[in-house]
């Protein structure tokens, strides 16, 4: 039995690092089991699992660097505005989700950082957008990654700028082994804790680099919900007031 205390999970770097340092060697585990806590006011005391395959989405974290030409805000015609380019790129990427992704697939694209400029009256030299693409469909993932790059370059070219796209990290969908998952769900049902309830066929829109472990050995992954049923449970995961 090996206990894996995974580091760097939030930046999707921990699993690969631990594999490189031999977590799956000497001896090689027969199977892997992972549990992730989740805050959910309406689902406290549940465990979610999926014996049918995909439990969590893939994730591709990207960084888009836009290069323009700095100038005084009073003379925009003398520069190339990277913020303007970034705004158009952000809107266009959302259109990819609403118009090119199959509505039956789980697919989200989020820009979580948009950094540019140092003063209110200066058009800066560059702007940086960072975000994530998540989906449960392999072909959708491949198509959107290709289209993202195409859209970014064409928009930058339209407004006379240039763009660089860096893939910061990539993680596949987390696939659960059906037999192992059903076996563990049965064990959970026998614990005998009052109010503990299993939710089968669950799919989380979040992502987890434990998926890289799941690519190599049979794996089951469960989400355990905890928290409070009163107003303390109103705050979601990653909120500074989450309890």
Place the predicted regions along the sequence by residue.
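Histidine/acidic-residue-rich, glycine-tolerant segments that coordinate divalent metal ions
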Residues: 1-124, 207-210, 233
């Amino acid at each position: 039995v090996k206990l894996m205390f995974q580091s760097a999970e939030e930046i999707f770097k921990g699993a690969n690092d631990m594999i490189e340092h031999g977590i799956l060697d000497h001896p090689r585990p027969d199977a892997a089991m992972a549990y992730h806590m989740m805050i959910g006011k309406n689902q406290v005391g549940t465990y979610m699992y999926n014996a049918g395959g995909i439990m969590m989405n893939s994730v591709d974290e990207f960084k888009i660097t836009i290069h323009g030409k700095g100038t005084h805000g009073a003379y925009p015609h003398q520069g190339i505005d990277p913020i303007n380019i970034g705004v158009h790129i952000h809107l266009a990427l959302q259109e990819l989700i609403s118009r090119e992704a199959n509505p039956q697939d789980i697919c989200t694209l989020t820009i979580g950082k948009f950094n540019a400029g140092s003063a209110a009256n200066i058009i800066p030299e560059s702007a940086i957008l960072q975000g994530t693409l998540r989906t449960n469909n392999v072909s959708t993932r491949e198509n959107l990654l290709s289209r993202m790059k195409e859209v970014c370059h064409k928009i930058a070219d339209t407004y006379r700028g240039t763009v660089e796209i860096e893939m910061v990290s990539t993680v596949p969908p987390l696939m659960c082994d059906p037999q192992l998952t059903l076996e563990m769900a049965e064990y959970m049902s026998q614990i005998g804790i009052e109010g503990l309830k299993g939710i089968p066929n669950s799919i989380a829109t979040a992502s987890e680099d434990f998926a890289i472990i799941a690519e190599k050995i049979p794996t089951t992954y469960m989400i355990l919900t905890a928290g409070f049923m009163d107003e303390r449970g109103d705050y979601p995961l990653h909120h500074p007031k989450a309890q």
